[in-house]
From Swiss-Prot:
One of its GO terms (molecular function) is transcription coactivator activity. The lineage of its organism: Eukaryota, Metazoa, Ecdysozoa, Arthropoda, Hexapoda. It comes from the Eukaryota. Residues 189-213 are annotated as: Disordered. The gene is Bro. Disulfide bonds: none annotated. It comes from Drosophila melanogaster (Fruit fly). This is Protein brother.
């Protein structure tokens, strides 16, 4: 008795690539587009006004400096002032338990109407202002910290100007992505006959149906 093997069986036994997988190697590679995660949500103002966390943070409440908690108070005071002059500070909004790493422009500009880090505005206090994106919304921290107690009061405001800038960038990003996807479909979309159609139409080596007789 003779045993016959088809090409697929022989290829599998020899560790070769089966015919159908070998054919896939000749397909034209398609481009891969990476859509960067948006920095902001589509309607920032609406989220700022309706989100419970933002509503709580928008009301002025107690804040505390949280850096170097294990150090003596005198050293913490010195480090807080040094950090502020370098352009950053670790602040906690006590009521909500929200910890913030603030960054701001510590360079004193005599022509600016308001400083991001102002030691001169009020004796014994530093007034801070810092803009950042929180939960997809552009906000601005505004408040003060007592240089002796290392606590104070602050709130979060909606940063209208930066929100508009981020919205414009978001729309450009979406438009660019859609254009690239449309161009990709136009270039690389080639109609292909489904594999099962070979059986219905009588592919190579297969008998044709009644209509082909």
């Amino acid at each position: 008795m003779h045993h016959h093997q088809n090409l697929g069986d022989a290829a599998a036994m020899n560790g070769m690539i089966p015919p159908y997988e070998a054919m896939a190697m000749y397909e034209q590679p398609k481009p891969r587009f990476i859509f960067k995660m948006p920095r902001v949500v589509p309607d920032q103002r609406s989220k700022f006004d309706s989100d419970e966390l933002f509503r709580r943070l928008s009301r002025e409440s107690e804040v505390r400096y949280t850096g170097y908690r294990e150090r003596a108070m005198e050293e913490r005071r010195m480090r807080f002032v040094n950090d502020c002059r370098k352009g950053y500070a670790e602040i906690s909004m006590v009521a909500s338990g929200t910890n913030l790493q603030l960054y701001f422009n510590a360079n004193h500009n005599p022509y600016a109407q308001e400083q991001d880090c102002d030691f001169e505005r009020e004796r014994g206090k530093v007034h801070l202002r810092s803009s950042f994106i929180m939960n997809g919304v552009c906000v601005r921290f505004r408040g003060w910290v007592d240089l002796d107690r290392l606590d104070g009061a602050a709130c979060l405001e909606f940063d209208e100007q930066r929100a508009q800038q981020e919205d414009a960038q978001l729309q450009e990003q979406i438009q660019s992505y859609n254009q690239r996807m449309a161009e990709s479909r136009r270039i690389y979309h080639t109609p292909q006959t489904p594999p099962e159609d070979h059986h219905h139409r009588g592919g190579p080596g297969l008998p044709r149906g009644p209509m082909g007789w």
